[in-house]
Curated annotation (Swiss-Prot):
Subunit and interaction comment: Homodimer.
Membership in a protein family: Belongs to the cysteine synthase/cystathionine beta-synthase family. SbnA subfamily.
UniProt cofactor(s): pyridoxal 5'-phosphate
Keyword Amino-acid biosynthesis carried by entry: no
Regulation: induction: Up-regulated under iron-deficient growth conditions. Repressed by Fur under iron-rich growth conditions.
Name of this protein: N-(2-amino-2-carboxyethyl)-L-glutamate synthase
Listed Gene3D superfamilies: 3.40.50.1100
Keyword terms: Pyridoxal phosphate, Transferase
PROSITE patterns xrefs: CYS_SYNTHASE
GO terms, molecular function: transferase activity, transferring alkyl or aryl (other than methyl) groups
UniProt: pyridoxal 5'-phosphate binding residues: 77, 185-189, 272
């Protein structure tokens, strides 16, 4: 038997987590802004954490067996994470997606050989989430040994981030954390990480970054194009009282934020990261200079080449927001 060093993992799943943190000196020179690079997980996003945590918990407790057929509604990243882990574990998986999934994400999911169900009809809010959930319910009623991941209501979702990135953040940042800024969709990441951070930094302010037109915090629903941030339903795992501030960012602003991050820091990240950059820019106009801000960069930019990094898409979003061309 070949002896392996501690740096050699037995499985790709062992490389989930322990993502690096970087300080964004160029973008925010008057504040200490630390970003956790969650896009450096093996599946390319922070969704590797709940996918691994939920599946391994299910296997441990006998809820998931070799005959189980996993089912989940996803805008892309969780689907990729589940597909990766299902392939490693030898499990069947069906991902329910909609037309707003990025073409790259859809290709990646299909490359793993899992089943893909594409819904076509938008829901009452103009999105597809409720339509996807209806399709999930239909599949649960017809597929034998089906197991729904159910990320919007599954307490294991936020727990994965509490024990994962949340713990890693408090182990890395030793100075007091004044603000934790995170995007929301299922709200699992902001709930889990903030709860862990508050245990060590009780005075931290929790700032949620939501999409304009998302209903999570009561905004009026409008058509949204950017996947991975916002929702057309309020997640069951959200506790609104734990959020101190909400900043809404539209699709056009998000794209500009992504491009600015590349220009200043050389970081090529996904759409919700652009929303985070815009939100932090707004936040620092009203807080003390030198404050410590911690955030997360959820996924990779190469999954959005047809969206936020497309000049055609950018012009479309610019026109939709009524921004006049210079």
């Amino acid at each position: 038997m070949i002896e392996k060093s501690q740096a050699c993992h037995d499985s790709l799943l062992d490389s989930v987590g322990q993502t690096p943190m970087v300080q964004l000196h160029q973008l925010f020179p008057k504040h200490e802004v630390f970003a956790k690079l969650e896009y450096m997980n093996p599946g390319g996003s922070m969704k590797d954490r709940p996918a691994k945590y939920i599946i391994e918990h299910g296997i441990k407790h006998g809820l998931i067996t070799e005959n189980t057929h996993l089912i989940e509604s996803t805008s892309g990243n969780l689907g990729i994470a589940l597909a990766m882990i299902a392939k490693i574990k030898g499990l069947k998986l069906t991902c329910v997606v909609d037309p707003k999934i990025s073409p790259t994400n859809l290709k990646i999911i299909k490359s793993y050989g899992v089943n893909v169900e594409m819904v076509e009809e938008p829901d009452a809010h103009g999105g597809y989430l409720m339509t996807r959930i209806a399709k999930v319910q239909e599949l649960l009623a017809t597929i034998e040994d089906a197991y729904w991941i159910n990320q919007y209501a599954n307490e294991l979702n936020w727990q994965s981030h509490y024990h994962g990135a949340g713990t890693e953040i408090v182990e890395t940042i030793k100075q007091p954390i004044d603000y934790f800024v995170a995007p929301v969709s299922t709200t699992g990441s902001i709930m889990g990480m903030s709860r862990k951070i508050k245990e060590v930094h009780p005075n931290v302010q929790i700032v949620a970054v939501d999409a304009k037109g998302s209903v999570i915090f009561g905004d009026k629903p409008i058509n949204r194009e950017l996947p991975g941030i916002g929702a057309s339903r309020v997640p069951e795992i959200l506790n609104r009282s734990e959020i101190n501030q909400v900043i809404h960012v539209d699709d056009y602003q998000s794209a500009l934020g992504c491009r600015k991050l590349i220009d200043y820091e050389g970081i090529f990240a996904g759409g919700s990261t652009g929303s985070i950059i815009v939100a932090i820019e707004q936040l620092i106009t009203s807080i003390e200079e030198g404050a410590t801000i911690v955030t997360i960069l959820p996924d990779r930019g190469d999954r959005y080449l047809d969206l936020v990094y497309s000049d055609t898409w950018l012009e479309k979003m610019k026109s939709r927001q009524g921004v006049k061309s210079e």
